[in-house]
Design a protein with these regions (language model features):
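Active-site substrate-recognition segment that forms the wall
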Residues: 156, 199-206, 310-312, 316-353, ...
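N-terminal glycine-rich dinucleotide-binding loop that anchors FAD/FMN and/or NAD(P) in oxidoreductases
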Residues: 156-175
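N-terminal Rossmann-like FAD-binding beta1-loop-alpha1 element of flavoenzymes
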Residues: 114-139
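Rossmann-like flavin
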Residues: 170-279
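Extreme N-terminal leader/targeting segments of oxidoreductases
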Residues: 17, 21-23, 35-112
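C-terminal catalytic lobe of FAD-dependent flavoproteins
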Residues: 44, 394-396, 404, 408-514, ...
Length: 526
């Protein structure tokens, strides 16, 4: 028997232990090791007696606590993201310091008012808002370690956006009035985000967002969008020509110019997530890692959430699982998302001479105009972080060719970094909706289930606002939320945006492969 994790339990200290390396258990420090509750899905014997208890099992392998992270995990194939898996080996986790204390795994049956599934930016933001604004102390359930998913695997770019559509596309889809209201929602979200993180030490890098034209052919689009932003939305977006961009911002060798947006921040995602965790617990929320929801039954107005350590009975459930939403979590979520893999690398620390030679003159967050976009920035400690598309499937994610593709993109932008070593490389799943916009909704007004999903890679900032809106819904104050992102449900897959049907779901990845080829042609050739 060996201790593999420690957490607080009020005045007590508890240890998570492994026996024969097969499953995880929770015991109090003063408890006899032959009389503890086995928190695993198998036959058990208690206190040297012959009491045998059979617990329902869905995924025995998912009950191993603090297992190494699974690089080939795939949300379309795996019933859960695991149980107690360690973090991906990202730059953010390596430089965030020790994670704050949490509340340990669920270790008994319990009744709660509100359960939140997922402890990333959205889930923790919802727990904060529920406690602070509505007096509700949520119970947050996390399959692995706190904020284990893309909340600690992203690029740390807090942009004034929600979903993947431009403001011009909002106008085309919903009309001017709705587009203006959506813009106001994003601005309000950015201000809320700034207030929320004001006392969190998360390496904030202000300065706005640079949207770089990676080819001259993309400059007219940026010029049109900047004009719409200024004249229609009263948002001070400015066009930078290639010379101005290189002299004052960044010497990206692909860049033909850029659009500068006034709102945009760089943050350290793991430090931000850990700050949210501390805020949520300080307000009375409880956050339980290694507690995946392995079964969900609704009966007589109660939601019975089966975890390895016990059943959580909740009056209301908020889902904030992002790109790690399994197909089997709940029928209302099945086939509603398209999980997309994104790769990221971080170089070794660059010398001041290397930074100068490569024209890295700003710490602003940057994306380019590719459909399969690159996102990049200089970190506070002088490294280049850059990310872009990855494999189609989890099984393909560890293939080094995707890292090489990303490094080729980096070298096209900054040839002087060709021989610079890479200290960190990882990938994560992004929750993309089938219409490129998120939903923060109660899909059935008669059932207390709510979700906030589908940010499409723009969740660093908006997840804070989405968590607040999710809390409004859960607290019964969501009636005033009347924008399209607060109504209906996430749509099923579609063909060319015309025909929508769940029948297309089995062919999503075939379509993704075809789209990636088409997007490559649009980005690099046409």
């Amino acid at each position: 028997m060996a201790p593999i994790g420690r957490y607080s339990d009020g005045p007590h200290v508890r240890w998570r232990v492994s026996i024969q390396g097969t499953c995880s258990h929770v015991i109090a420090a003063d408890q006899r090791p032959d009389a503890f509750l086995w928190v695993c899905m198998m036959d058990i014997a208690v206190d040297q007696g012959f009491l045998r208890q059979r617990l329902p099992s869905r995924d025995v392998s998912a009950t191993r606590a603090l297992d190494r992270y699974d690089p080939a995990y795939d949300p379309l194939l795996s019933p859960t993201p695991g149980c107690g898996r360690d973090y991906a080996p990202t730059y953010w986790i390596d430089t965030a310091g020790e994670p704050p204390v949490d509340d340990g795994p669920i270790d008994s049956d319990r009744e709660v008012d509100v359960a939140i599934i997922g402890s990333g930016f959205t889930g923790l933001s919802a727990a904060i808002a529920l406690a602070r604004d509505h007096g509700i102390r949520a119970t947050v359930l996390e399959a692995n370690r706190v904020s284990w998913g893309c909340s600690v695997r992203n690029g740390g770019q807090a942009q004034c956006a929600s979903g993947r559509l431009t403001r011009s596309q909002w106008i085309a889809r919903w009309g001017l009035d709705t587009a203006l209201a959506l813009h106001a929602e994003c601005l309000d979200g950015m201000e809320y985000f700034k207030r929320l993180i004001a006392d969190i030490d998360c390496d904030v890098q202000p300065g706005g967002h640079l949207y770089v034209a990676h080819r001259a052919a993309r400059m007219p689009m940026l010029e049109r969008e900047a004009k719409v932003l200024r004249e229609v939305f009263n948002y001070d977006a400015q066009i930078l020509d290639a010379d101005t961009l290189r002299r004052h911002y960044i010497d990206d060798h692909e860049a033909a110019g850029a659009m500068h947006e006034p709102e945009g921040l760089g943050v350290h995602p793991a430090k931000l997530a850990f700050g949210y965790l501390e805020k949520a617990r300080a307000l009375g929320a409880t956050v339980h890692p290694a507690s995946p929801v392995q079964g969900w039954v609704t009966k007589d107005g109660w939601h019975h959430l089966q975890t390895p350590g016990g059943v959580v009975r909740a009056r209301a459930v908020g889902v904030a699982t992002g790109g790690y939403t399994s197909q089997t979590l709940h029928p209302r979520l099945r086939n509603r998302l398209m999980p997309i893999l994104s790769n990221s690398v971080v170089t070794r620390r660059l010398t001041p001479e290397e930074i100068e030679a490569n024209g890295l003159r700003t710490h602003q967050v940057i994306t380019d105009t590719r459909v399969l976009r690159h996102y990049y920035r200089l970190t506070p400690d002088g490294r280049l972080q850059i990310g872009s598309r990855s494999a189609i499937t989890g099984r393909g994610a560890p293939d080094k060719r995707y890292e090489r593709m990303l490094l080729d993109g980096m070298v096209r932008k900054f040839p002087g970094l060709r021989d610079v070593s890479i200290d960190y490389s990882w990938w994560g799943w992004v929750d993309v909706s089938h219409d490129m916009m998120p939903r923060i909704v109660q899909p059935d007004p008669h059932v207390a289930i709510y979700y906030a999903l589908g940010y499409g890679g723009n969740g660093v900032m908006y997840a804070a606002q989405a968590g607040r809106r999710l809390a409004q819904w859960i607290a019964g104050a969501g009636g005033s939320l009347n924008l399209p992102i607060f109504q209906g449900q996430l749509p099923f897959p579609n063909v060319a945006g015309v025909i929508t049907s769940e029948w297309f779901a089995p062919f999503r990845r075939l379509g993704q492969r075809a789209l990636y080829r088409w997007y490559h042609l649009k980005d690099e050739v046409l």
